[in-house]
Every structure is written in structure tokens, then in C-alpha cells.
Amino acid sequence: MKEDDKPKKITRRQAFKMAGAAAAGIAASSLVRRFVKPVNIFASTKEKEPAGAALVATTEAERKELAQKLKNAKPGEKFGFGHITWHLAQEYAIMNYQSQQQAAEQLGLNFMGAVATTDSEWLETAESMIAKGAKALHLNVPPMSVMPELCRICDENNVFLSTNFGYTGDVFPGDYGPRWVVDNTPLSAEQTYPPLMLLMEKMRQNGRTKLLHHQASKTAATVSTVYINLGVFMAWKNYPEMHLLGHQYGEWGYEGGRKAGEACLAERTDYEGFWGANDSQTKGALSALIDAGVNIGPFTASRDMELTTAQDVLKGEFLVTSGFAIPYFGGRTVPMLYDMCVGAWYPLRDEMIQAGRLDCYGRPGEIERLAESSGIIKNPSFSIGPTKENIEKILIHFKEDKPEYPYDFRLLSLSKCEELGLKYDRHAGGGTELAPLSHNYYFPSKLRKFGSLEAVRKHVGALHKYFLDFNIDTWEEAEEYAKQFPPELKTETDWQ
């Protein structure tokens, strides 16, 4: 490969520069401070529940009926699509934004994007986008406090709504009417268990037991926080000699991760391995450890498969990360919403919670050996994707002003395929070479261990009770703690 063709490492400064440019651009292009139908944001919980809350589809006949009843556009119509995110200071958030813009433009829609940091900004931004013609909105990590009101706004204006990391045991799509239709969130226990098994196996082989454990957040995307901590519990059961230490929250980002790392260094410095809740906060914590002379990079694992982490993996400075093909994960929601807008599809009740499949990325050779010796290779959820090829063909585009990821999201739209004579492709043209499993998704309610959406709800509710703060140091203590778990809290390492 020529020198000019080699992937260039993106610096933290470049990432934040991109985020700032993106934020400035979207602010200028999308926010018009106009309100649609007036909404009383101080209404009681009872008042906030839309009149259409009972509209759900449980059969194919009801699916077709609701698709036609709720449609708000005609096939081929050019309407607005709005994306609101809680920040753009993380590679995941930027790639999610970029891929939704790409998908919207491929489908011939007017893309609008914005950052919202307060409850009022979430509400006002949604209203502004609807006033500008948005017929579908997507929210990345919305605060749960605004969901009843946002659903009411969308219900009153016949606008479809989807989310990433937008549910808890108390709040699900469909709870506030028929227009919050989908939440797309990986089951992060499935994304934690395999890479952590690999890390603990490597630590065992090297006589290491002191594992620095960083959690995610008690306030943002808590559904992922609790899933991740469940995955930690699942892996730990196979390596009871490990001591989990630190337990700080990295708040999903580089700066939060660095603060968490500094807090742990104030307690001790003899850490021998590191599990972080996602790549961004883990990289931040590693920077603090390195500055303090604690170099445990090759004994580090996390989840997301962001560019800078993947580059460190190939350099031997990071063991493994588990990815959900972020650009595919982000972009695929757009054609699904388009199909709902034009009446081509509507989810059944148990299809409203969705999750992406997952792949692990590490150094070729090492990750396979660890998978064999740990036994994780026998788990159907375990899959290995090519790290170098992902960098060169997908992740490197993250640095571009307006990237074109290797997907044609029209192929995921039932309506667009019919309109244009295309063949439907669940992988959106991305194939399975770069992402053997993660160019795909599934419905958690249909997993064997759940079997219904209500079982998923009870599971997530129990996880929020027992795993929002998992600050246990020894496996003996964890075993004792687990005696409290109710039967609805599923600890089986089976996602089939």
C-alpha cells in the first residue's frame, strides 16, 4: 500500500474540531425557533399520555391497518428528516449523525440535524424541525424526562419518532402513543461478554488479576450502562480470581474517562488490566494512566469499534473492542422510518425494541488464540471481523467533512425498492466480509430467554435495580449479591 493510501490516525484535537464544525453547520441549517401546536410542558403525567396510546399492532392485519392509518407522506415525496443528538464529542455520535445524513440524502429526504443539551432544547429543536417539514425524527440518547412530551408533540403533528439508547424498564416505544415506533440499541451485555472473556483470558495466562473496571453513566443511556455491567458479571463468573477495582463512571466520553482514570489513580496504581464501558471513555482513562506511568494498553478491552481504538488495536496498544457497525447501525433507521411515513411498513409491538448484531475486532492471530482457549469461540454471538479492512473501508471516512460510507440505505427500504426496482438487502449493500454479524439486527423480544416484549421490560427494569451501580470487588461478593436477583433478570449468555 502506498504511503498516501495508508490510514491516517485521527487525533483528539481533530475529532473535536470536526464536532465543532458539524455543530456549527447543523445549527445554521436546521434550527428555526418556531413552535408548532402549543404544548404545556408542565402538564401532569396523565395529561401527557396521548389519546392514541392504545394503537399497537400485534398481527399482520393490524400492521397493515396502522401503516395506512398513520402514514404522513406519499412514496417518493421529499420531506424533512430530523436527527437530534446529545453531543458530537464522541466518534460514535459523529458517525451516527453522518450515516443518518447519508441515508436521508440517499432516500431523497431533506436532512436536518442538531445538538440538544437541555430538556427545553430537545423540545424546542423537535418543534422547530417539525415546523420546517420534518415528518420523522430520530433521537440519539434522549433524556427520559422529555420522552412523554416529545411523543405528545409527534402524536399531535403526525410525526414518526425513533431513538438510540432511549428506553428503560419504565419507558418503551409504544408507551406514549403509536408514533414513537422504534428504539435501536445493542444488547450491550452481548457486546461486553465476548471481549471481556478475551481480556480476562489474556490476564489469566499472564498471571494478572487486578482489573480496573470503569462503568458508563447513571444518567445517560442507562439502558446500556446496565446491560454492560450485566456482561461484566457474565464474564467474571468464568474468571473468579479477578479483582475488579475502581468502578468509576466515564460518562461515555474522552474527558469523562480521563477524570475517571485520574480518580482511580488517586486510590492505587497497580492495575494490571482495564475494562472500559466504551472506546471513547476508555481512551480518555488510558491517557491518564499513561501520564502516570501505568502502561496496561495491551491488556485493555472495551466496546464500540471506533477509529482511534481500532488503530491502537493494530499497533498492539489495545487488545480488543466489540463493534456494532456504527454507520450501518445509525443509517438503517432512516429507511425504516421512511417506510412508515409512506405506509409501507409498521412495526408489531414486539418489533419496537431492536438491537444490532456484534463483531469483535482485535489483532489477527492473538484474538483467535484467546477465543479458543477461553471457549468463547463456541458462543454463537461471538464473531471476529477484520480490523485493518474496517479501518480502510469504513472507519477512515469518519474524518471526512461529508463521508460516504459503503452502504446504499435505499436497499433497506421496502418502498424505495418498489419505487426504483431495487432488490431489498438487509445488509444495505455492505455485505458480511467487514462485519460478519453486525450488518444485521434482531428483535430482543424474540430471543429464547425472553419470548415477549414484557419479559424484556421486566429484565431491563431489574437490571436498573441491580446493575446501574456495580461496584463489587471480588467474585465471592458478586455471588452473594446475585442471590437477590429475581427470575426476570436473565444471566444466561445466550442471545439466540
Residue ranges and their predicted role:
Residues 181-211, 257-258, 305-309, 325-344:
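Hydrophobic alpha-helical segments within soluble ligand-binding/sensing domains
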Residues 44-78, 216, 332, 336-496:
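Hinge/cleft segment of the Venus flytrap/periplasmic-binding protein
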Residues 50-71, 78-99, 112-124, 132, ...:
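Extracytoplasmic "Venus flytrap"
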Residues 1-14, 24, 28-29, 35-42:
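N-terminal secretory signal peptides
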Residues 123, 137-156, 231-232, 246-312, ...:
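Hydrophobic alpha-helical
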Residues 92-106, 191-195, 223-242, 256, ...:
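Short, solvent-exposed amphipathic alpha-helices that sit
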Residues 147-190, 306-312:
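Flexible loop/hinge segments that line or gate small-molecule binding clefts
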Residues 105-116, 212-213, 238-254:
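Short beta-strand elements in bilobed, periplasmic/extracellular small-molecule ligand-binding domains
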